[in-house]
Amino acid sequence: MESIEQRVKKIVAEQLGVAEAEIKA
């Protein structure tokens, strides 16, 4: 079972990835 911290970090990483993709596009 993932801890809340791990889940938050995963979500943040995904959001940053999307932001980077949009900036580079």
Curated annotation (Swiss-Prot):
Lineage of origin: Bacteria, Pseudomonadati, Pseudomonadota, Betaproteobacteria, Burkholderiales
Keyword flag Metal-binding: no
Posttranslational modification: 4'-phosphopantetheine is transferred from CoA to a specific serine of apo-ACP by AcpS. This modification is essential for activity because fatty acids are bound in thioester linkage to the sulfhydryl of the prosthetic group.
Family according to the record: Belongs to the acyl carrier protein (ACP) family.
Family annotation (PROSITE patterns): CARRIER
Protein name: Acyl carrier protein
UniProt pathway annotation: Lipid metabolism; fatty acid biosynthesis
Main location per the UniProt record: cytoplasm
GO biological process terms on file: fatty acid biosynthetic process
Organism for this UniProt entry: Alcaligenes faecalis
Subcellular location: Cytoplasm
Function field: Carrier of the growing fatty acid chain in fatty acid biosynthesis.
Domain of life: Bacteria
Keyword ATP-binding attached: no
Transmembrane region(s): none
A Gene Ontology term for the protein's cellular component: cytoplasm
InterPro entries: PP-bd_ACP
UniProt entry keywords in alphabetical sequence: Cytoplasm, Fatty acid biosynthesis, Fatty acid metabolism, Lipid biosynthesis, Lipid metabolism, Phosphopantetheine
All residue ranges annotated as the Carrier domain in the record: 2-25
